[in-house]
Amino acid sequence: MNKWFGDFQVLKGINLEVKPKQKIVVCGPSGSGKSTLIRCINRLEEHQEGEIIVDGTELTEDTKNIEQIRAEVGMVFQQFNLFPHLSILDNCTLAPIWVKKMPKKDAEELALKHLERVQILDQAQKYPGQLSGGQQQRVAIARALCMEPKIMLFDEPTSALDPEMIKEVLDVMVNLAKQGMTMIVVTHEMGFAKEVADQMIFMDEGMIVEKADTNEFFANPKNERTKLFLSQIL
């Protein structure tokens, strides 16, 4: 798969297969194409060459396909993107009601279940501005789970958080992984990666430079660029 922004090629010859229940962590320096890669998976960014197939559905120009895939692919960003004028509960029920046409009562039951799952059930009636950054990011995870996705994409979900709030978000992600969620996570949290990832991907200059099982990646990286990166962040 290839992608350009104008004349600049941001993704070069990406070849990746993700199996159900697999946990992949993508790392690499700033500007290496990590975020663009996962944003292409649910068509937030459009790729120019190659195929992206999610659960048997190819991501093409067909908006019906795009909508179907987006309903199956949850996404959590650096910024929480919660609606400030809606309660936490209403933030979580919005998509199931409007996209899945779920009755409000069912959507609320589902939302409360996932708010409990991310350990924030007691904040359901509050508004985003009343919550800490870590709490808001956990709400964002619950909101994505309310669409009952088959895969979750995380784009540096802790990078905008104060250090003391990072652990509460990572704990939720660890639990998700243990419960069998298929996950692709862009992060520099290498402790999390060692605990959760089945496979590590290192990207640089728009390419997958190294792809390996987690233990092998940390114990015996092959590429010099990977070795340098790990020496700087570990």
Set out the residue ranges of the language-model regions.
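A general structural signal for well-ordered alpha-helical segments in protein cores
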Residues: 193, 226-227
